[in-house]
Amino acid sequence: MSLPEIARGSEHLVLFDDQTSEVVKVTLPGTYGDYYEIIDGRISQFDSTPAEYLLRMRWWEKLFSTAPDPLGLTESGQILSRQKFISGEPPQQEEVDQFLVEAGAEAVRQKCWLWKMADVDPESEIWIGDARSDNFVLAEGKIIPIDIRIWGVPIPTQGR
């Protein structure tokens, strides 16, 4: 079965399954997204591993209930996932920012689309990156994340 391509980004090829009204995401070869940390006051970017990519989906589902479902791997190690196609309009960035605040997030570097949530995990802050308006959709009066990056940043232990 051949599915039509509807988008291609820095991380995924996105195909549309007309029979199920779902998108199929295929990571680009050797690409599993990235994450950020602030080191010496500067944002530093790191490549994610396949395990971190899959963990992202778990956090995404726990926090927002809209994550893609992982399906498996291609022979070349690309991760396949399915996600319900959500029809809607692109929200304004201010609406996305307000959605994140209402979800319990606080801006780390808002102009860099970088947020965090404390009190979700006892050992880590959960960071949300790439929270740009084009990675969300406004449908039925709700903001829905459709392509975000989520990772844990360990909480420093006091007294070390």
What are these regions (language model features)?
Residues R58-L114:
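Conserved structural core of kinase catalytic domains
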Residues S2-E61:
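ATP-binding glycine-rich loop module of kinase domains
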Residues G33-I39, E94, P154-G159:
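A short, polar/proline- and glycine-enriched secondary-structure boundary/capping micro-motif
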Residues V26-P29, W113-R160:
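Catalytic activation segment of kinase domains across protein kinase-like and atypical kinase folds
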Residues F16-D17, E75, A131, L138:
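Generic beta-strand structural signal
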